[in-house]
Amino acid sequence: MSDDKLDTLPDLQSETSHVTTPHRQNDLLRQAVTHGRPPPVPSTSTSGKKREMSELPWSDFFDEKKDANIDGDVFNVYIKGNEGPIFYLLHGGGYSGLTWACFAKELATLISCRVVAPDLRGHGDTKCSDEHDLSKETQIKDIGAIFKNIFGEDDSPVCIVGHSMGGALAIHTLNAKMISSKVAALIVIDVVEGSAMEALGGMVHFLHSRPSSFPSIEKAIHWCLSSGTARNPTAARVSMPSQIREVSEHEYTWRIDLTTTEQYWKGWFEGLSKEFLGCSVPKMLVLAGVDRLDRDLTIGQMQGKFQTCVLPKVGHCVQEDSPQNLADEVGRFACRHRIAQPKFSALASPPDPAILEYRKRHHQ
């Protein structure tokens, strides 16, 4: 069915309704993308029970863990899926590719796609000769080289998705044309230039306020949840262990000391709004609650230059706190822009009687 027909399709909640609705296309895409999802597991009370804090393996979420050898450096990459468009996921500072674990699993149930989540320089299981050069220039070169190492000349459409620092790098990577394949879309999660630049002043204090070490992985996961750093126990159990490293028996410290990279922080975010608006591909900005858009983004939003999505009841790490809702939004966005196809077509289920009646009336 063409976009024009979708835009004029009546509200089919009532068989007799003839009022057109411009938002019907979104409703149909949501139905097509989410149709067939298993019903959510009923929540259970944890009162009186000890919450499980053990580490979850990467293999519960991804299909493959691969090394990308680039000029003597070894970048660890998590991969899910073997066909379809490529979703290239870039994590924020201090995290790893496993921050996307729950989201990747959810997205793969909705659309046919490949998900690729590298550990960037200095993070996770990646090993580089210079672990602390997190400059914008070095990192976007890394991102381009990792992609080429994994996919070669694959010309499948690519959707670059980045969170926080990774969101800034996604924008810079796209504008610098570091990925030769067809970049079809850009999704940036919880990074706005104005807010990010303001937050940098308190970042060192925040980093020093965290525990310097943990006696075990379980204690680190417990801190991650109790501090509100993550709100999803499953995400914390797979992501938090990759953010720390064992330095001695019963002592784990942070994988990367982000304070040593302070000189690069400003370069990640400065001029980001104009660069974001200058990207010619379809764009979506995902925010954790209501954020203040700066002047450039406010004007751009009013002009329809990008889509905004606000997810409620989440912290900064949206992909960990609400992976299902984020996957729904990303899946709908990808289908709307013809980047991906839903795995579960509405045609696979018994047709809605209202739709049949509408088609009968209009001889479709």
UniProtKB/Swiss-Prot annotation:
It catalyses: [phosphatase 2A protein]-C-terminal L-leucine methyl ester + H2O = [phosphatase 2A protein]-C-terminal L-leucine + methanol + H(+). Residues 11-23 have a biased composition (Polar residues). PROSITE patterns: LIPASE_SER. It comes from the Eukaryota. Keywords: Hydrolase, Serine esterase. Its EC number is 3.1.1.89. One of its GO terms (molecular function) is protein C-terminal methylesterase activity. Residues 1-53 are annotated as: Disordered. The keyword Hydrolase applies. InterPro entries: AB_hydrolase_1, AB_hydrolase_fold, Epox_hydrolase-like, PPase_methylesterase_euk. The active site is at residues 164, 190, 316. The keyword Phosphoprotein does not apply. Demethylates proteins that have been reversibly carboxymethylated. Belongs to the AB hydrolase superfamily. This is Probable protein phosphatase methylesterase 1.
